[in-house]
Every structure is written in C-alpha cells, then in structure tokens.
Amino acid sequence: MRLLVAAFLLLALGDLGPGGAVHFKDCGSAVGVIKELNVNPCPAQPCKLHKGQSYSVNVTFTSNIPSQSSKAVVHGIVLGVAVPFPIPEADGCKSGINCPIQKDKTYSYLNKLPVKNEYPSIKLVVQWMLLGDNNQHLFCWEIPVQIEG
C-alpha cells in the first residue's frame, strides 16, 4: 500500500519541474480547440521570462477546418496596447505542423519565444495566435508574464 501511495505522489508531483502545462485565456480560437499549452521553462505563473533567454512553446490543438497554410502572430500587450513580439519562425507549417491542416485532426505546434536583452523589465500579457487561410484563428491564447533582467 505504501508503494502505491509513493507511486501516486511521484506521478502527481512529477509535472512540477521546470515547465509544463500552463493556464491560459482563450482569446478567440474561432476554428480550433486548444488541448494544452506548454511553456518551458515556466515552473510557476506568471511565467518569469529572463532577458537573453529563449523559451519553448508547445500548443496541442485540434483544427475544426482544413487550411493550406498557418501563420503565427505574437503580441505583447502592455496597458491594453498590442505590441508586435517577433518570433524566429512565423510559418506554422515549419513549426511542427504538417500542412495542409486537416479538419478534426490534432496537431502539436512548436516554436521559440526569444526574450531580447533590450526588452524592458515589465509585466505584460503574451498573446499568441495561429492563423489559417483567410486569417481564421486556429488558436489564440494569452498568458501573463514578467520580463526580468
């Protein structure tokens, strides 16, 4: 019985490492459903993003439509103003997704979020959208972050 309890605790606490699923706000996934969002490393929320480092982003989602293409658009929202947040690869078809995207299929989107040294130390909201054909939102999520030196 003790072994069973110990095994359960290990499984339950195993996801408390350097990153894992984060709680997010869906900001309009009109033609898709987000199954899970992982930001690594992000052991606690709000995620603390350190200047000069890069963070991996993995979004598992299901598309409700077919789409020939996908494009990521990322913003930092500061005081209600959306400021473009450049990422290394905006083409979702080069970020873990085998295009064309098929209806009712689940995908794992992978990308990096680089935090440049020139960014100010500030609290903000990261908004990340993946757009399909005709700019339809395959997914859109927001999480609060803290950029630190």
UniProtKB/Swiss-Prot annotation:
Acyltransferase found in the keyword field: no
InterPro entries: Ig_E-set, ML_dom, ML_Npc2-like, NPC2-like
Alphabetical UniProt keywords: Acetylation, Cholesterol metabolism, Disulfide bond, Endoplasmic reticulum, Glycoprotein, Lipid metabolism, Lipid transport, Lysosome, Secreted, Signal, Steroid metabolism, Sterol metabolism, Transport
Pfam families in alphabetical order: E1_DerP2_DerF2
UniProt note on tissues of expression: Epididymis. High levels are found in the caput and corpus regions. Weaker levels in the distal cauda and in the efferent ducts.
Keyword Secreted belongs to the record: yes
Protein name, entry field: NPC intracellular cholesterol transporter 2
Protein's organism: Canis lupus familiaris
Lineage summary: Eukaryota, Metazoa, Chordata, Craniata, Vertebrata
Gene from which this protein is expressed: NPC2
